[in-house]
């Protein structure tokens, strides 16, 4: 089964917790703090495996959660960093953030890697918080939460040449004649429902990969007839071979087919029209084909070069392959996406720097709800089992301006303040 789009969940490993510990050694009075830092959580890393051809495996496993870092230990020992979680994907995979639509990675070459969900850093042990005024702190941080997100994986086949056209114009037959590929061929529409790839050798030591793409219909750019699923596979091709049925047996007019398919390519993605297109008049072995070809030439004009062929008898196929090979030698690749490098601040929330700190809303029962990347991260990294850590968290909230903001919103003594799923009492 060919699967070319899936949605999965990925989560980087949480950082290990820092430790509160003290040096206890004979003849060393007042040894001081000796709690180690936690280890970094593992990243979720996508790696291209050239042997894969489909996203089928992701139908059965949709959640990928990396291991957390090891906790800090006594005697100043830091926790171990966890090994990254490796997820193998086929070449041609594009990774998008499901929430924002941002392109995270375009993976095309063997063993190419991309970090899709970063692991959190380890929490600091109490030895990190020692000062002249507080030489034996009872403070340690929890590990930073790992990044988590839903992502969309899209597979766009890696081919140099794409065969496009209406259903039943002979694309699959042409591919089977010029390569060792054996696509399904039958006398009904949409026999081809998944892309078929074949390696074409021209006989003069040149070769290229050709893709037989499922037939298009009018409205494909808007998703009609699974158009989006089919058209995405054209995006990576460098040369488009437009196959047109000249027999007239399907009751369609060749010029109308030509215009309709080109409009679909243009409407789907403007850059598809930048690629060189080879127009192929197929089924020239049929009775009315020559007459239909002459009428077609009159309508398209002399500027369009047409290759009359018969995929069944192989008439004209050799000249077609040489033309395609010549075009490939002079046509560069067309990058479809600019992958944006993420900064840590933009990993999960796409706001400006100020809005990342916190936001205060009020529920119908009067509870104040505080949310935002910075405050939630600070909250998760606080060890609330220790009084000194709680006091530090209160100072951090004041430093962010949360106390003042709550007063400005009308908060009074005894009001309930909520962060994530935890509730606190506001004391002025």
Curated annotation (Swiss-Prot):
Q: What is its EC number?
A: 3.6.5.-
Domain spans labelled OCT: 350-428
One GO cellular component, as annotated? cytoplasm
Q: Where is Mg(2+) annotated to bind? A: 172, 192
- MF terms in GO: GTP binding; GTPase activity; magnesium ion binding
For the keyword GTP-binding, the answer is: yes
Which cofactors go with this protein? Mg(2+)
Q: Give the record's keywords alphabetically.
A: Cytoplasm, GTP-binding, Hydrolase, Magnesium, Metal-binding, Nucleotide-binding
Predominant subcellular localization, coarse grouping:
cytoplasm
Reading the lineage from the top rank, the first entry is Bacteria
- Please state every residue range assigned to the domain named OBG-type G: 159-329
Give the enzyme class. Answer: hydrolase
Q: Cite the Obg domain residue spans from the record.
A: 1-158
Task: Give the residues the record marks as binding GTP.
Answer: 165-172, 190-194, 212-215, 282-285, 310-312
Entry's localization field: Cytoplasm
Report the family membership: Belongs to the TRAFAC class OBG-HflX-like GTPase superfamily. OBG GTPase family.
- Kindly state the subunit structure of this protein: Monomer.
What is the recorded name of this protein?
GTPase Obg
Species: Bacillus cereus (strain G9842)
């Amino acid at each position: 089964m060919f699967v070319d789009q899936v949605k999965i969940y990925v989560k980087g490993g949480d950082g290990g917790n820092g430790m509160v510990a003290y040096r206890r050694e004979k003849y060393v009075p007042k040894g001081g703090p000796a709690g180690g830092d936690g280890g970094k959580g593992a990243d979720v890393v996508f790696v291209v495996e050239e042997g894969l051809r489909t996203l089928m495996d992701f139908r059965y496993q949709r959640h990928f959660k990396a291991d957390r870092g090891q906790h800090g230990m006594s005697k100043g020992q830091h926790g171990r960093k966890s090994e990254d979680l490796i997820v193998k994907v086929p070449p041609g995979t594009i990774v998008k953030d499901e929430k924002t639509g941002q392109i995270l990675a375009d993976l095309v070459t063997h063993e190419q890697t991309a970090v899709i969900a970063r692991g959190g850093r380890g929490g600091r042990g109490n030895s990190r918080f020692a000062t002249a005024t507080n030489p034996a702190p009872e403070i340690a941080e929890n590990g930073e939460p790992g990044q988590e997100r839903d992502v969309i994986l899209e597979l766009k086949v890696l081919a140099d040449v794409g065969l496009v056209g209406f259903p039943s114009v002979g694309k699959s037959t042409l591919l089977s004649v010029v390569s060792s590929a054996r696509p399904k061929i039958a006398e009904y529409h949409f026999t081809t429902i998944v892309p078929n790839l074949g390696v074409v050798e021209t006989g003069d030591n040149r070769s290229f990969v050709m893709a037989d793409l499922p037939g298009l219909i009018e409205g494909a750019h808007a998703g009609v007839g699974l158009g989006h699923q089919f058209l995405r596979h054209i995006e990576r091709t460098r040369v488009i071979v437009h196959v047109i049925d000249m027999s007239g047996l399907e009751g369609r007019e060749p010029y109308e087919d030509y215009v309709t398919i080109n409009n679909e390519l243009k409407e789907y993605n403007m850059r598809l029209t930048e690629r060189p297109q080879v127009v192929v008049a197929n089924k020239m072995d049929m009775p009315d084909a020559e007459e239909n070809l002459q009428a077609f030439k009159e309508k398209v004009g002399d500027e369009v070069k047409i290759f009359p062929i018969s995929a069944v008898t192989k008439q004209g196929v050799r000249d077609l392959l040489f033309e395609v090979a010549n075009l490939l030698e002079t046509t560069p690749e067309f990058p479809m996406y600019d992958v944006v490098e993420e900064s840590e601040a933009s990993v999960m929330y796409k706001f400006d720097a100020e809005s990342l700190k916190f936001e205060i809303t009020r529920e119908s029962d009067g509870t104040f709800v505080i949310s935002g990347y910075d405050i939630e991260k600070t909250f998760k990294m606080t060890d609330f089992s220790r009084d000194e850590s709680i006091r530090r968290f209160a100072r951090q909230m004041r430093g962010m301006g949360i106390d003042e903001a709550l007063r400005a919103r009308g908060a009074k003594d005894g009001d309930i303040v909520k962060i994530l799923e935890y509730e606190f009492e506001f004391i002025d």
